[in-house]
């Protein structure tokens, strides 16, 4: 079993080692190229692979709620606002982009993204649906980074009992 959160530059090497040794892979690496994603999905034929942009149970639930809201409110404006600490490099974050993919799949709309880098914020994501006279906001706030490690260990435990395939965090819930 390998758990990998490195940069995209190291991803291909760890995937190759897992395939060679027939070991499961849990990856939280964001910023992967389309080619790397395809390689990961293809490798799912050979080993169990789980990829997630975020290993928080709360974000997994948020994603499901966003999917439902996106189906019902597809004629509303949709914005995703995310905030992280000042040292976070990618903007928008991988989690914001994943939420955006959920919005697109559910509603057919591309959301607007707004990224903040401030202080020591662990991670906040809000998906806002707005229409004339009303607004629905779905928000998740991480206040402690331990939740991500706990989620990765949960994923590793669950994926170890799964057959070969490509999985996402929500598939384990």
Which positions does each model-derived feature cover?
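Short, surface-exposed loop/turn motifs that are enriched in glycine and acidic residues
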Residues: 51-59, 85-92
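Short N-terminal helix-initiation segments at or just after the protein's N-terminus
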Residues: 25-27, 76-77
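Short loop or secondary-structure boundary microenvironments that flank
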Residues: 7, 29-30, 55, 85, ...
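Rossmann-fold NAD(P)-binding glycine/threonine-rich loop
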Residues: 9-21, 27-51, 57-69
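C-terminal substrate-binding/catalytic lobe of Rossmann-fold NAD(P)-dependent oxidoreductases
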Residues: 74-173
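N-terminal Rossmann-like NAD(P) cofactor-binding module of classical short-chain dehydrogenase/reductase
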Residues: 2-3
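Residues at the start of alpha-helices and the adjacent loop-to-helix junctions
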Residues: 6, 10, 144-147
């Amino acid at each position: 079993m390998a758990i990998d959160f490195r940069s995209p530059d190291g991803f291909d090497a760890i995937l190759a080692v897992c395939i060679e040794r027939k070991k499961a892979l849990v990856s939280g690496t964001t910023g992967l190229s389309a080619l790397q994603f395809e390689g990961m999905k293809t490798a799912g034929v050979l080993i169990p692979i789980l990829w997630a942009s975020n290993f928080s149970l709360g974000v997994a639930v948020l994603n499901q709620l966003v999917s439902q809201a996106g189906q019902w409110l597809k004629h509303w404006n949709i914005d995703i606002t995310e905030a992280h600490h000042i040292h976070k490099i990618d903007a928008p974050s991988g989690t914001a982009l994943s939420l955006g993919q959920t919005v697109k799949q559910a509603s057919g709309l591309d959301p607007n993204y707004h990224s903040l880098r401030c202080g020591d914020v662990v991670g906040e994501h809000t998906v806002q649906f707005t229409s004339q006279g009303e607004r629905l906001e779905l928000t998740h706030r991480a206040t402690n980074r331990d939740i991500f490690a706990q989620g990765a260990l949960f994923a590793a435990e669950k994926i170890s009992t799964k057959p070969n395939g490509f999985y996402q965090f929500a598939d384990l819930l």
